[in-house]
Amino acid sequence: MAKFLIEPHFRLQEWVAEEKGYFRAEGLAYEFRELVRATGGKIHAKGDKVGAFQSFEEGRKSNVSCACHWTVNVAASNGHGRMYTDVYSVAPAGIFVAADSKIKTPADLAGVPVSVGYQSGSHYATVQALEAYLKPDEIKLNYADGMLFARMEKLIDGTAPAVNLFSGPYYFAEQLGFRKVIDTTFMIGTRIHGNPDPEDLRNFFRALRKAQRDIDLRPELYTHYYKNEFPDRFHALMDTRRWGPGERLVFEPYT
């Protein structure tokens, strides 16, 4: 029987469960695979209009994949896996600009291209947040800067005027002095790929639930795991002791 394939999703829970041995304690025979740091971030440099939904179309390999709940719903309805409805998560996110940017308020983003992941949480959450300030024709989105870590690099390099970030890149931008103009926190759903044993799925999420409790109690013990998914070239700049817990799993039905 094939091993249960686990890929972390830029969050802490999978790393904590791995460190504490929770997956093995639940009886999972699994393989743990990381793809962002391993590719130097290139996996997120997908080009224009290639985001979470397109990655589902291409075929993600892990048995459990995560994306914003909008994208997971659409992917499942189009035959790209199925949605797991016993858990969801909430990811703090925001639109960041340089410290010296003339953009001070959300209204100042009128006509400014905001870098987001195409058909991803950052895409929909940006529109949702800015609708309170701007007319539809004033909201400008840039899909060409790629997915999460690729967008982060554009912000740091000064080649993108405004970027939507979440998870580790969110905290890294804060640490480096970039300003958050508006919050864009969004929900994340879970997609099941292939036909994993239902008991393996239950074991996997039981392990993550234990990890979530650990993070809730002492997040500062685990924020160093963000480094495991950052390209090595950023490590010397990172002070993860200042970072927060990020995405939080909610073990309630998604309806």
Model-derived segments and spans:
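Secondary-structure end/capping motifs
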Residues: 198-255
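Short, hydrophobic alpha-helical packing/hinge segments within bilobed ligand-binding/sensory domains
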Residues: 52-55, 148-155
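Active-site glycine-rich loop that binds ribose-phosphate moieties when present
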Residues: 136, 143-152, 165-174
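Structured segments of extracytoplasmic/periplasmic soluble domains
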Residues: 112, 129, 133, 154, ...
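Periplasmic-binding protein-like
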Residues: 12, 89-99, 174-212, 245
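A structural preference for short, hydrophobic beta-strand core positions in alpha/beta folds
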Residues: 32, 141-143
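Short, glycine-/small- and polar/acidic-enriched structural segments
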Residues: 1-136, 161-167, 180-181
